[in-house]
């Protein structure tokens, strides 16, 4: 967060009229600090988090109708929730309501899961069998927009009690070794490209190019973005970073009002909203005890107070070289 504050001051000084598109995580905390330091910043956040369910639904449409060529963008949605933990309460294709179709799939595959590539989740933390999505939908009546691992991380330990529990839901945790391998692979690819290898043609993992094109006057775009809540999600705290659709056009980003989350989904979300607020307050007041309280209040926290205190101290010790700001 101190780095975000530094970026914010530099943007205000060098290019105050620029549009800033944040892809950094944690999305909500980064955006909150950026706006706190430079309130007039033209800021929005975007990621590929919400692609997971739309891609699943596009596949379902093709399978159920016996057609091909339905893309993620062909699935129209109403999106609402906090950044990183958003939901769809409306999904359509060509004007047809797809919620009944989704319910049929959820009921049929709630136990076995619905897999594109059998057992891929065992080696790829970004793959899953959609069992968590189906379970949350059948219990809460609303579709998680994110992949199963991400959705599970925002819930109590229903799905994440241990690796055996996660495996039973057919998803895997994100491990340090996996992240290191991905980083190493990407670093090797970048070096090859810098040495003259031709860049491959590939589909971008976010809609950033389309967003930039729309902001520059290249046509209107509806895209999922993160923005401070100004009423677009009625029953989430004012100012918290929320994720909804937005109409993006020349020099303009206008959030689409998503409405209200069902109370059960809102209850899961509000806890995270206030925890994120506490983490930012810890930065502002340079008080790591405030962050500790947010750590204790995370839904996946199952440790007793003594064990949690020891774990927190161990975490701080491991990253102490990055915490000099809090010692000033």
Question: How should these model regions be labeled?
Answer:
Residues 28-31, 53, 231-234:
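Flexible loop/turn segments at secondary-structure boundaries
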Residues 1-38:
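Rossmann-fold NAD(P)-binding glycine/threonine-rich loop
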Residues 36-41, 64, 95:
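A glycine- and small-aliphatic-rich helix-loop capping segment at beta-alpha/alpha-beta transitions
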Residues 39-57:
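Acidic, His- and aromatic-enriched active-site or binding-groove loops in soluble protein domains
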Residues 18, 41-42, 75:
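A structural micro-motif
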Residues 20-24, 45-46, 79, 224:
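A structural signal for short, well-ordered beta-strand segments and their strand-loop junctions
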Residues 65-328:
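Long, compositionally biased stretches enriched for glycine and/or charged residues
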Residues 32-36, 56-58, 89-91:
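Short acidic, glycine/serine/threonine-rich loops at helix termini
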